[in-house]
Amino acid sequence: MSLGPELATKEQIREIAADYGLPMTDEEVADHIELLKGAIASYRELEHIPERKLPVKYPRTPGWRPTTQENPLNGWYWRCEIEGAKEGPLKGDRIAIKDVVCVAGVPMMNGSKLLEGYVPEIDATIVTRMLDAGATIVGKSACEDFSFSAGGMTCSTGPVGNPYDPTRNPGASSNGSAVLISTGQVDLAIGGDQGGSIRLPSAWCGVYGLKPTYGLVPYTGCAMIEGTLDHVGPMASSPKGIAKLLSVIAGYDADDPRQQGRIVPGFDTNYLPALERGVKGMKIAILKEGFGHDGSDGMLASDPLVDDCVRSAMETFRGLGAEVAEVSIPEHLTAWHIWTAIGLEGFTAFGVNGNGVGTNWNGWYNTSMAEYLARAMKSRPYDMPATVRSVLIRGEYFRRYYHNRYYGKAQNQRHLINEAYDRVLSEYDIIVCPTIPGLPTKMVDRDAGTLDTVVNQLNQLRNTAVCDLTGHPSMSVPCGLREGLPVGMMLTAKHFDDATLIAAAAAFEAAGDWRKM
């Protein structure tokens, strides 16, 4: 057997042609096999070329699966102990990495049985940056299956419990990271965000989580959902932790097309000075459309306790010298519909049909994960949970019968939402609304039907998904307890003005214990 692809058989050519509705004579089949020989020669040559890999600079062992005693809320997927540089700004910090991020030699499953057994051979760009800064990586945090859930019960290693009430959803999909920070098991953590997955669990677990400006933090070496929505960012127990971690992981990366020339070598990534800025003179806009949702469209209804808590936080900002006024962005209410089309069809194309990497972008491709996932999808597709099956079925339905028309229209419309936010942010420094309209919801039984499961796990995104569309930096800040459960307020700023979010969060933290507000 030659190294590389084999020449196709007649049956394989006919099968491919049939998939596209192309009738072929025996002569045409023979012609296509002959034409394939040139491509086979190129592919075999490509097979011999050593593949460029992302670097692995620090020694480590594979680690271990945590015991039940070590992991009462299922916040961990895997434990390890990887020591970084001897000195650096993250020296002494213990960091958990969401299990969508590759760490060489450490098992990775992206919350899914389909990837169980996969071990990356590379470190994601942000992992190398953290280790170079002296961090100690102490494990992979649990996440939802393929990260496509906003609740907290689809992780294949078991549902992740809310630290304030284990019977309730912790928010998702970066729920493991939020839980580990909330319970003091780590100092800092990495989360991913395509529809709110950093900010949602931060809100319901009472921690800080920043979805950075799109492209600011390299996504290279992380599992993709949809290339135009993918974000990765810091989570912490304080704004200082956010600033410290963001300062290390942000910046130019030639392998990430999401940066699109907006971030160049030498881009300033020091966010620590923002901690001392305060909010005096800052103009803060309360987003009218972020409050008062009635839930009639199936999304989570607003809880008056949450709305009042966030509005009370605005009074704190006023007391600190900020100017606060209400604004209206009607496009905020349609953003969820735009996100739905991009999320459904984009994930189907990238995450499933594209084997987790997709095509048509210029950057570093994780070929080992793509091959592993493709084989798993073919041999055991039944391992997909109800949420992922639902996304796949719906996404493929719209692709197959409506020819990506609505995906394209949604991509065109997202720029109008971006412009609407930019208009307000040309007059204000920050836009504020509840991160999630309601308090943490009760978990449904893992054996619940598809409808109950999907609704329970995907109805929290109304306020968060919009900034994944626009790319604006957006941060969840804990602002109070109601009925013993955390409430998060979401702060949004201009593109690449992540520092202003950190400044506002630090000022609010200094104003008093959020648990008593």
UniProtKB/Swiss-Prot annotation:
Keywords: Hydrolase. Exhibits poor salt tolerance but excellent tolerance to low concentrations of ethanol. EDTA has almost no impact on activity. Activity is increased in the presence of Ca(2+), Mg(2+) and Co(3+) and inhibited in the presence of Al(3+), Zn(2+) and Cu(2+). Optimum temperature is 55 degrees Celsius with ethyl carbamate as substrate. The urethanase activity remains above 75% between 45 and 65 degrees Celsius. The keyword Hydrolase applies. Optimum pH is 7.5 with ethyl carbamate as substrate. Exhibits relatively high urethanase activity (greater than 70%) within the pH range of 6.5-8.5. Has excellent pH stability between pH 6 and pH 8. GO terms for molecular function: hydrolase activity. Changing L200C: Decrease in activity. The active site is at K98, S173, S197. Hydrolase that can catalyze the degradation of ethyl carbamate (also called urethane), a probable human carcinogen widely found in alcoholic beverages. Can also use methyl carbamate, butyl carbamate, acetamide and urea. Also catalyzes the enantioselective hydrolysis of 2-phenylpropionamide, alpha-chlorophenylacetamide, 2-methyl-3-phenylpropionamide and alpha-methoxyphenylacetamide to the corresponding acids. Is inactive on benzamide and L-glutamine. Homooctamer. Belongs to the amidase family. PANTHER family: AMIDASE (PTHR11895:SF170), TRANSAMIDASE (PTHR11895). This is Urethanase. It comes from Rhizobium radiobacter (Agrobacterium tumefaciens).
